[in-house]
């Protein structure tokens, strides 16, 4: 039994196409706008929505909340397809039938969370990604057919995160892999000393007030 079969048995077929009247909007029919950053390497997947590649070669997924500027972080995955499935289930949970999907069958093959709570969406995204994981991945499968190894889905969410939590990858945004490290090191450096090269008769090395200028 493959991962998807186990996934279907666990969650049923509540999301099968109904009467063939629903035709989801696909990412392939909505070309992406060129990125405005010309000096930085493009990290977005050329086709899949909500999918970006890290410098390590892994793929991350996130989804924008409707009518907000915040995004819900969905996780880090081994393949772009897993990240794309994670985005699809999140998009369906937040936008329903108006969601733009990476795969047409996501509309009826994925378990949609009952609420739009960030934690519920993140959990459903992880389940969807693992159910459609690449068969070439050498992983161990649990009795339910879902691979729950940390190497497959990393940093999905923590209990401390609020429902409105979102993720921003500054290192990828600014094209500087060591941006945060450099900032941290800079904060540890002492401030430069101020030397005054002025001679005042009878004053020697006395302090000079900034307001005297």
From Swiss-Prot:
Keywords: Activator, DNA-binding, Nucleus, Stress response, Transcription, Transcription regulation
GO CC entries: nucleus
Coiled coil (residue ranges): none
Induction: By cold stress. Subject to degradation by the 26S proteasome pathway in freezing conditions.
Pfam family, one: AP2
MF terms (GO), sorted A to Z: DNA binding; DNA-binding transcription factor activity
Gene Ontology BP, a term: response to cold
Subcellular localization, as worded in the UniProt entry: Nucleus
Database matches in InterPro entries: AP2/ERF_dom, AP2/ERF_dom_sf, DNA-bd_dom_sf, DRE1A-I
DNA-binding region: 47-104
Highest taxon of the lineage: Eukaryota
PROSITE patterns: AP2_ERF
Positions of short motif Nuclear localization signal: 32-44
Quaternary state and interactors: Interacts with 14-3-3 proteins GRF1, GRF3, GRF5, GRF6, GRF7, GRF9 and GRF10 in the nucleus upon freezing.
Protein's name according to its UniProt entry: Dehydration-responsive element-binding protein 1B
Gene: DREB1B
